Amino acid sequence: MASNIFSRLVPQDRGRSFYEDLRQTDPDADLESRAGIDIDEENLNRSYHDYDLDEAERLAGDESHISHSRGDVAGANTVHRRGQKANTARWLGAGVEDDVDNDVPESLLVETPRAPQHLLLSPSRAGPSHPRPTAVPGPSTRQNQAQWEATRHQQRLHNDDTMPHGPFSGRAGQGRPEPPPVGLMAGDPYEQAMWRWVNVSNLDNFIKDVYAYYRAAGFWCIIVQRILELVNAAFVAVFLTFLSQCVDYHKLPHSKKMEDIIIPKCTQNMSLVWNVGLWLFAIYFICRCFGLIIQLRQLKHLRDFYTHLLKIPEADMQSVSWQDVVGRIMALRDSHPRTAGNLTRVQRAWIGSQSKERLDAHDIANRIMRRENFMIAMLNKDVLDLTIPLPFFRNKQHMSECVVLAISFSILDFVFDNQGQVNPEFLKASRRRQLSQKLKSRFFFAGLMIFVMSPFIALYLILVYFLTYFHEFRNDPGALGARTYNSLAKWKFREFNELDHLFNDRMNMSHPFAKRYIDMFPKRKTEQVARTVSFITGSIVAVLGLATIFDSEAFLTFEITPDRSVLFYVSILATLWAVARGNISDDNEVYDPEFAMKSIIEFTHYEPDHWRGRLHSTEVKNEFSELYKPRPQIFLEEILSILLTPLVLLVSLPNSTDQIVDFFREFTIHVDGLGYVCLFSVFNFQQGHANQKQAAAADAPDNREEYYSTKHGKMAASFYGFLDHYVINPKTGLPGNQLPGSRQQFQHPPSFPGLQSPTLAADMRHSRMMRERGRSSGVQIQGSQGRTPQFRTPMPQPSPMASILLDPHHQPAPGAFGSRSMHRSRQMAVPHRGGYMSDRDIIEEAVTEDGQDDARFGKLGDEDIDESGGALDESTWQTSPTKTLSRENSGANPQETEVGVLGLIHQFQQAHMHLRR
């Protein structure tokens, strides 16, 4: 609601935007662009093709100011648009002769056929041209006509029209889709859904809508949620009107019936302010109803997309996983590959950020969290000054939902354009001063609007919070001490490319450990006072309770103090007793705050450098308590934030405008097919250790390396958290997002050494030693993780490179895992002492005796091989469904110090195959 109010109160310039005014009023910038001699950076490294000549001819006839005549090859006679002045380039002088030193024969010169003069007229005079329709194969029936046109639209073999259609049609920046073919809208729902998918003009908004539809659990859940929101809003308005305008509170002490205190015809005697408020609410309510009706069409399209294209029925929307949705989107993309090669300049510019080829799990997360990634990075790099300019709050960062909305409006809405992309003008160093001044003005406007609306927003939040939680606090007084993470903690803990539902799940799993840590920490003085209060209040309540047993009717009306009966004091004392008991620790609880904090860090992935080695200290407990606060305290801070946010926007944040502009310029990169994204959100899957360097940058003496790195190991934690969600199978805890039995398998043929084999005894001793080592190291070998017997076909295991949710260029290298990703799920489920993987040392790697890193070369150490059940006689890895396992790309370690007879046979087979090649 607050964001909608912001967008409606912002002065909108329908004529031109701030960036257009900036380009026109800056005389020193873009001189090359105005002179026509700037470098085309977009096509600087692009290869030249023959079909570019056709595009150049079309541009010359439609848009260009310069075109050659039909008979003039050497000169350049210009043809102008009507009403425009000729603007000939300096290097295309009229009558310039060919270079006499040119050794290329004229017969080898490639020239495009010149268009007639009547085709070089302006589009307004020439008018649109309609090509002759192609004949329909077979009988010309209505059904065949509709199918033929749908096929021509989806699988176009040659250009039937003079101008491109679909999402590439129109001028740059428009991307208007082609209108549906005749008869398609009345045809098959699958064809309709496919047509809408092919003609998506803004891929970012579409993917966000798909994700929002998934979060809301389908069509009917969204409809019910929207209707109930309207019902709740109407109830609050009617209920408050009744309580404030229709009840005579002066008659309440002396009345016994509702009719005695109700004011007759109260709606006709309401105050002017309340009448205006009700009319404004009525307008808002009607707009929401019309918005819901209009939104039904979009929701129906999303339902068709899930049902017909992704093959996910409406009944499964509440139980399907997001990984399954991503996999089906990739399958839909792969089933309709792009075959067009002769793209125009407008098409290339459009596909630079809207390409459907960039739709794997990594790209989808980047599209959904394009804005949030910049927000996470700004808070991690301490770019924003969020301190309160008051004497007692200068050292505290103030982050609330109100501040988040203000930052989203002031910064993100200014940086991003209507297409969801970073405006290129914001990335130019020459615009730094103007952009900084504009940010200051936006901060001032946002602070002023929040200050004006603060009384109404505060009153609304207080009423809603009171009506929501009063019954809960009354029935369970201990809920007053329930804690949760505040807004600052959520943005500090959130990782790059981590979607909302994944982040919420991670935070929810950390709540039991956080509560245990807070309750465990020494509070002896508080407990002593709580025990005394509990004893006194409990004793009084017990005596009063026993007295009510003998004569309940007379004793409950007995007044202990004037106008205060026994029932009143019993309720008050019972509440105090419950609050006191809630502050007393359990007698069976084990005191170990360091172990409890390690369990929290396993889920939050947040451990500042000054926490290391001091997890038991009171300072760490106080810092964590600032992030994990009681719910009533968070609510009071949100109410107070409405008054403090204008101070932050008017005083503190304007000091950070230069740093904000520099941050976006230095930490924004362009990815082909994806557009502008945050630097830290692009993971280097091929070199997993490159992401780990982000975590160790604090130890590096190079200030430049530290400047371009994240703090507290955020980059490494985000990278491995992403692998856990999209590479590690959540059902098995192993790499790969398919069950092992449903994937391609490679099994070595079983070989049985004879009983007289001289190596049989040694091999059996070796197997016994490996099992003993596994038991001594505390490794639990059970189920599919146990070591396969020597004389049986081994059980195949997944490959860390096998993820169907990542494209080949995003497939992680074996060294990116080490042994960490294989076992991190189990470590997070059951934390153990000394087993915490910090953000900086987030990779657990096996080191050989020579000191070399096995994980760097994609190998496993001895303990890892023993734990995973892999050896030379076993199939240790399994490839993705689109690739077959070969001996070169398998993850098995071909070198081992001790090998048995099966290992020797396997090495002999490998050597024999290499010789045959």
Curated annotation (Swiss-Prot):
Acetylated by HAT1 at Lys-621, which increases the ability to bind vesicles during nutrient starvation induction. Phosphorylated by ATG1. ATG1 phosphorylation is required for preautophagosome elongation. Coiled coil: none annotated. Residues 248-275, 561-564 are lumenal. Residues 1-226, 297-442, 464-539, 586-633, 655-917 are cytoplasmic. The chain crosses the membrane at residues 227-247, 276-296, 540-560, 565-585. It is found in: Preautophagosomal structure membrane; Cytoplasmic vesicle membrane; Vacuole membrane; Golgi apparatus membrane. Residues 16-37, 119-177, 854-895 are annotated as: Disordered. Glycans are attached at N269. Phospholipid scramblase involved in autophagy and cytoplasm to vacuole transport (Cvt) vesicle formation. Cycles between the preautophagosomal structure/phagophore assembly site (PAS) and the cytoplasmic vesicle pool and supplies membrane for the growing autophagosome. Lipid scramblase activity plays a key role in preautophagosomal structure/phagophore assembly by distributing the phospholipids that arrive through ATG2 from the cytoplasmic to the luminal leaflet of the bilayer, thereby driving autophagosomal membrane expansion. Required for mitophagy. This is Autophagy-related protein 9. It comes from Pyricularia oryzae (strain 70-15 / ATCC MYA-4617 / FGSC 8958) (Rice blast fungus). The gene is ATG9.
